[in-house]
């Protein structure tokens, strides 16, 4: 951040002060962590594998390795707050599926901003007796080192068991060749084959499908209209969704829990598996051996008791997210604390936190047109007026002249007869639209044409939500070295770890032009469905609001040639037992949702671990 000498932080930043986290010597004599329940059969202290983070990527590692016989411990800074199914999606309640706008508050309550610039607005109307600050150092968790002009202001994290999968959209598209990282050099067909294998397995873990909304009137209304308008130009389909439809009005949305049941093992259902989950544990650093070739222990802090422990394992896997993986590594001596200095690059992982990417996002909401709404009941024969004696609504099942299938017409007829007070012919519990036209070279952005809850975009009570269609288009960003995530040696976050700071701008040239083209595309396309909702006109959203941060610990074939941190098995260069998982591995410019791709890379990583590390023997309880 560029500061002037009149800014109080200017002089402070030039001092030799270091935060407690930056000063802290790496302890080497921490006690081992006791088991969560010493009565659990087969429990002991040393593990085959420790996993940091309990989101879908951590659960992918857990599933693959626990089922292969490894003794696994998982640590998460968050607590269990998703009910009986640990790490389950919080939208899996009837209440939120009946009123999706209520779920907005859940998302907002879960997200914690990563880097907030100092608010320099002075409250000069306080009582003269009240204490008043004379500087702009740190207040309300703000970051005085963050340049507001180079921030990802919308970037946030979720600190609960299950991570963001407890409130995500469940969109799981595959990347095409243009977006994917290469796993096989100089052989596109072989690369396609390995990706197809990985994607297929990941989709089975997530229960990804493209037919959960086949019998939604609103979904088909939007899908068919767009397919007609763009016939021969664009292909429209349902968004690939990690979800299972349980009945016509209820969907079970997938989450970390879908990938792996986070119950401790051994248990009745898995008597020969070994797994333990430790919530509310801050993982502070990994300890390197003297030769910098392996990790010897993980240092953690119990957030409830305040006690610190050293955890030993054969394999260490960090899946705490693109920000926190990088934060933990920097706090462990990888990369470097403090503002990046090109003249003095770090020795370990010099590209850590460089070349970061985040998608551009355009958003609007439309109210469906009268033409579309009237077409819903086009097969109905209507006699009389609603509420009057003799009013009837009927249709001819199977008639060749019908524009809609019988399931559609039956729903409309029943609704119009049973709810004559409703001016809309769409049933109250009709599922929302979930439409996309996928990323393609001619239109290199991802689209979500749907009705869902985000941290923004709630609809006021005066507008019937059945009429609303959300439009979210995601644009790719070229990786540039100057776009960085770095960590302060002076400021700490709420968990006493080095404060993350962004130095980011969308690059000029291709990235910026595609973002502008994407906005135009959304405006033209959305106008074919209806008029804009007041207050939700087409707009670019805050950088980072997509929450698809990537490239913080990039993947490649060669550390120096590819400017990266991990190889194609997600193993940190130079270390035989340290692995990183998540979107931070993805080094490419991508527009689509990255979770399925990150999960696929985790599956490949597990294949390497299983080939190179042997599970410890399992001793059944006596």
Curated annotation (Swiss-Prot):
Proregion positions: 29-38
Example of a GO MF term: flavin adenine dinucleotide binding
Free-text cofactor note: Binds 1 FAD covalently per subunit.
Localization: Periplasm
Residues in the signal sequence: 1-28
Cofactor(s) this protein cannot do without: FAD
Residues the record lists as binding substrate: 448, 450
Residues annotated as the enzyme's active site: 548 (proton acceptor), 593
InterPro entries assigned: FAD/NAD-bd_sf (IPR036188), GMC_OxRtase_C (IPR007867), P2OX (IPR012814), P2Ox-like (IPR051473)
The organism's place on the tree of life at top rank: Eukaryota
Catalytic activity field: D-glucose + O2 = 2-dehydro-D-glucose + H2O2
UniProt keyword Acyltransferase, yes or no: no
Sites bearing Tele-8alpha-FAD histidine, chain numbering: 167
GO cellular component labels: periplasmic space
EC number: 1.1.3.10
Principal subcellular localisation of the protein: periplasm
pH dependence of function: Optimum pH is 5.5-6.5.
Function field: Catalyzes the oxidation of various aldopyranoses and disaccharides on carbon-2 to the corresponding 2-keto sugars concomitant with the reduction of O(2) to H(2)O(2). Plays an important role in lignin degradation of wood rot fungi by supplying the essential cosubstrate H(2)O(2) for the ligninolytic peroxidases, lignin peroxidase and manganese-dependent peroxidase.
Similarity annotation: Belongs to the GMC oxidoreductase family.
PANTHER family tied to this protein: PYRANOSE 2-OXIDASE (PTHR42784:SF1)
Subunit record text: Homotetramer.
Protein name (database record): Pyranose 2-oxidase
Lineage: Eukaryota, Fungi, Dikarya, Basidiomycota, Agaricomycotina
